[in-house]
Amino acid sequence: MKTLKIITASFLLACAMLSFVPVGEWIMITTNNCKIYFPKKPTDRSGTVNTAKGNLKVNIYSYQAAANVSDDNLAYILTETEYPDSVINSDDEDKLDIFFKNSIDGIVNNFHGTLLSQSKTAIDGFPGRQVKLDLQQGKAVMNIRFYLVKNRMYILEIITNTNKDGNAAIEKFMNSFEIKN
C-alpha cells in the first residue's frame, strides 16, 4: 500500500512538472485545450466568475517582467474563458462580429486605452481578431489576439513600451499559441 502511494505521488508530481516544460529560456504552458510559451513561468489564476451570462470558467496565466530583467515587454497574458454554448460558439457566424466587438470594447474600457487598430485573423479555421491599443497616452502599447474556438475564448496579450513595439518576443509569444483539437 505504501509503495502504491509513493508511485501515485511520483506520478502526480511528474504530471504537474510536465505542464511547465522549458524550451530554451521559454516555458511551455499546457492546458487541456491549448499550449503557449512564456519567457518565464507565469502565475496561474484560475477559477469561476459569476456573470450575467452565467458562471464562466476562466484560466489566466500571466507573467510580468521585473524592472531589472532584460525583457522587451512588460507583461504576457493568456486568458481562457469557457462560455455556455447557448451564449456563443464559433459556428454562430451571425453573432461573431458583435461578440468580438463587445470583447474588444471591454478590454479598451478596462485598460482605459485607445483602439489603434483591429483586423480579422484565424487559427486552425476558427475566427479571431488582432487588436492594438494605446495605453497611458502613448507610453505603452498592448498587442492582443482574440480567438473563439467553439465556446472557448482565448485572449493573448502583451504589454510593451511604445518604443519597443514590434519586438521579436511579441511574435514569438503570439505565434507559439496552439489549440488542441
Protein language model annotation of sequence segments:
Residues 1-26, 177:
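Bacterial Sec-dependent N-terminal signal peptides
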Residues 23-39:
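Short N-terminal segments immediately surrounding and downstream of signal-peptide cleavage
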Residues 35-66, 100-147:
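Signature of long, low-cysteine stretches enriched in small and polar/charged residues
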Residues 40-44, 97-111, 152-181:
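Surface-exposed amphipathic alpha-helical segments
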Residues 48-49, 56, 87-90, 165-170:
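A short, polar/proline- and glycine-enriched secondary-structure boundary/capping micro-motif
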Residues 60-98, 155-156:
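A short acidic-to-branched-hydrophobic micro-motif
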Residues 71-73, 126, 139, 148-155:
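Coil-to-beta-strand transition motifs
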